[in-house]
Each structure stands twice: as C-alpha cells, then as structure tokens.
C-alpha cells in the first residue's frame, strides 16, 4: 500500500488473520491499567486485508501500545482497549504511526476504515 492515496470512503477493510497463534492470545490477555501503556507479551503477526491490498503488521515481544489514544472521557464510546477487533485497530494504528510506509493521513484513514468495517463503528 506504500505511496498510494487511500480515500476515506473508497478504502474497504475485509478482515484480518493472525499468522501466529500467540498474537491473538497476546492481544486478548492485555489488561487495562492506569498508565494505559500495554507491553505485548509475544510477537504479533497479522494480515489486514483491504481493497488496496494486504498489510502485514509484525511487532516484537514487548512492543508497547496505548490502546485507543486520547482522553479517558471518551472511553464510554470508544474504549481504551475494547473488543479484539478494536484492539487490532488501535495496534495497527500505533504500528503505522511509528515509521511505517503509510503517511499520517493514510494511517488515520486506515484506522477509520478498520473501525467501520471490523469494529462496527
């Protein structure tokens, strides 16, 4: 998906697939805490299938993500961790925000599409 313009309404996210069994378990085991910083217990390797191709997201054990960024006041609507699908959205957004191939704008467009198509927002 590098160097492609992702259009807010044209991008579709069809699903995700964990490449290793430990990634799903690792994300499911994360427990919310007051610091809102979550080190992953193992590698997470997953594929995000979109209308623009497939994005492979791989993290190392110990990768730190913060769930949904932003103030606690909106946790009632968009939880800091939430469902597995929401956690995947937050994780992929954090991974792309740390020097991956997508621009900041495209990273946010992918997040919005994932929330719409995977998490039901």
Model-derived segments and spans:
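Extended terminal accessory/targeting regions
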Residues: 1-121
